[in-house]
Amino acid sequence: MWSRSASFILDKRQQPPLDHDQKKLTPPIKMADALQNPKNPTSPSNISAYYQTRAEHHAVVSSDWLAQAQAAVLGETPETHRRSVRDGGGKPFSVIEEFNYWRKKPDLAEAVAAIMALAAVIRCSEATTMMELEIELTEASNTLKSWDTTSISLSAGCDLFMRYVTRTSALEHEDIFSAKSRLIERGERFGEISLKARKTIAMLSQDFIFDGCTILVHGYSRVVLEVLKTAAAGGKNFKVCCTEGRPDRTGLRFSKEMATLDVPVKLLIDSAVAYTMDEVDMVFVGADGVVESGGIINMMGTYQIALVAHSMDKPVYVAAESYKFARLYPLDQKDLSPALRPIDFGVPIPSKVEVEKSARDYTPPQYLTLLFTDLGVLTPSVVSDELIQLYL
């Protein structure tokens, strides 16, 4: 698969822009609908847990993708992804507590944290039939989804795990203990695949980063960071421009990472994007979700950066793991469930002044050039075609 991807990359550098009918690589994964609306008593009413965690958003993978990705892991089994459920001294098991334990790990995606928490539910379950186990998992899944109703990844991770429980016919012919063991193994394996996906994306993107180029980055994406770390480790000379990313100033954090790597970096105020775009060769962004249209949901400001880049004929590259593909089809910005964040202007704001607090926006596919995923290099139209076919 990777040799095909490499050929695709080299052709891109010598030929006109990609045709929408470019031959596809392995089909993207599918995802169940996200953003359910149960009441959430554990999060602040005005600030979403999405903003508080700043976690990446993920979706559902197929069993074929799991088999393919497992082979790519090359035997790596990080100890940080294996954990026995706490004895608790008789304390009732809490799926939210287990989820929070995994969510706090810096390199673990939020969807994988949900998978690990649901795997722990299986370990603690005293169910004697698959039906009883499914009921317990459904209740735990709904509890996790209600923790933050705006999180695409959280809902997707729960849907992923439930998919394996309800759609795997092989488990019907096994005793409950064997079935539990197999489901637990799948959850742990998915955690390993999550880390491997970023390394694969970093490898695929290297042919697009050339010596002397200037890259504009918006937000703090762990995938984009891995891409640039790999390029720097490979001896490539490039410069990075980071937007400040107000109000949470993710650009400051990203610029510090670049400085640690001895990569020349310039920090921009958000309003200086158009001013600086003329000296930029490409734009690299991550994604909280890749939707059916081929567009992306990402940190607020991504849309306007893509608009400026498009008007000045600069390529916009998206680095996103394939399990972020979401079965969503926003038509405009208002179709997104708001993920609110606190904003401090440094001065008192009159009560009559309305403040926009949304943390993310939607970028349509026509403003994106390519998506780098662990399945290969995809055009936005390929994402759209595959997701539509998967859910017909």
Predicted regions and their residues:
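Conserved phosphate- and dinucleotide-binding cores of soluble alpha/beta proteins
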Residues: 2-4, 11-13, 27-60, 65, ...
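Nucleotide donor/acceptor-binding cores
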Residues: 212-213, 238
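Gly/Ser/Thr-rich loops at beta-strand to alpha-helix junctions
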Residues: 214-225, 247
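Predominant activation on well-ordered alpha-helical scaffold segments within soluble catalytic domains
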Residues: 96, 112-119, 138-141, 155-162, ...
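A short, well-structured juxtamembrane/interface segment
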Residues: 193-210
